């Protein structure tokens, strides 16, 4: 996957740390560091820190904490797809056939967006239909119009993934620690 250089808090600057970008606060958009911080990340997507670079003493406009340059990679999304689309390596159009169940990725992927299935993890039922539990990458940025109704909050902007994806995905919860927070 593509590597991105961005900024995270000192506490998050650990190789292996995972976080999800939920939204971008207005204060961030006005910050001089925006283009090298949250401006490089996509709301609704999850990332893992793969490299920590030397700090340059940058401070966050919101938290006042030190921001550290890191290299991140987008992590695959775990969700449900119809069985006929669940083939490893295939690129398909996400149609939002499974909307409303715990494993549905509708708050991270937009209807009509192209996705690439990377791994089939198992099977699940949603509203009486059989689906495959899959890991996939979205190939375009999600449309966040109506994001609040899709479960994407505007703050905090980054929250950790509590655990690696399991066979029955559950919604992520936001953290009370501000724009960024650590894994437990």
From Swiss-Prot:
Classification lineage: Archaea, Thermoproteota, Thermoprotei, Thermoproteales, Thermoproteaceae
Pfam families reported for this sequence: UPF0179
Native source organism of the sequence: Pyrobaculum calidifontis (strain DSM 21063 / JCM 11548 / VA1)
PANTHER family registered for this protein in UniProt: UPF0179 PROTEIN MJ1627 (PTHR40699:SF1)
Coiled-coil ranges from the UniProt annotation: none
Region (Disordered): 146-184
HAMAP family attached to this UniProt entry: UPF0179
Record field: compositional bias (Low complexity): 146-161
Tree of life domain: Archaea
Protein family (similarity comment): Belongs to the UPF0179 family.
Protein name in the entry: UPF0179 protein Pcal_2106
């Amino acid at each position: 996957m593509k590597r991105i250089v961005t900024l995270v808090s000192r506490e998050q600057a650990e190789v292996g740390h995972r976080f999800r970008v939920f939204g971008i606060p207005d204060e961030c958009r006005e910050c001089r560091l925006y283009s090298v911080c949250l401006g490089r990340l996509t709301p609704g997507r999850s990332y893992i820190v793969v490299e920590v670079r030397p700090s340059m003493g940058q401070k966050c406009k919101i938290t006042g904490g030190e921001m550290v340059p890191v290299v991140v990679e987008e992590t695959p999304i775990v969700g449900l797809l119809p069985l006929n689309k669940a083939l490893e390596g295939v690129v398909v159009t996400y149609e939002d056939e499974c909307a409303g169940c715990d494993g549905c990725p509708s708050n991270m992927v937009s209807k009509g967006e192209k996705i690439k299935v990377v791994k089939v993890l198992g099977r699940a039922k949603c509203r009486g239909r059989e689906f495959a539990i899959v890991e996939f990458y979205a190939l375009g940025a999600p449309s966040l119009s109506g994001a609040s109704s899709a479960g994407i909050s505007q703050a905090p902007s980054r929250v950790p993934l509590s655990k690696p994806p399991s066979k029955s995905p559950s919604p992520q919860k936001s953290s009370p620690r501000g724009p960024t927070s650590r894994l437990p």
